[in-house]
Amino acid sequence: EKVKIKDLKTSIISIVNFVLVSERKSLDVINFLFCDDNTIIDFNKKYLKHNFETDIITFLYDDTDLSESDIIISLETVNRNSITYKSSYLIELFRVIIHGLLHLCGMEDNTKSKKTVMRKKENYYLKLAGLIN
């Protein structure tokens, strides 16, 4: 899928703003780092003590005057997931972005039931964005 970078950036900003307003969450700064598997493995090792790739890592820093966060996304893993789940790359990318935002809003996915709730919320926002039916 070919998408102009400007259009993609605008779409990401729109979904970020929409999710945060809908979830009643205010953040001063969200930094996105789009990277490869090796980079996200390095972050996983350093901060989470995992030695494997993940599609996303989300950090919220509340020890500063600003409400600041980092969302790190492996585009290689997003691509593999889009193939595995028979989804378009863009839908999977936006699903992962929404997933990270939901973590910043306080949602967890550390149990099966919490994963189900989070997946429903991801689908809700993907539908509102017109990305899925």
Predicted regions and their residues:
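An acidic/histidine-cluster motif and surrounding catalytic segment
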Residues: 1-94, 105-133
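Catalytic acidic motif of RecA-like/P-loop NTPases
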Residues: 102
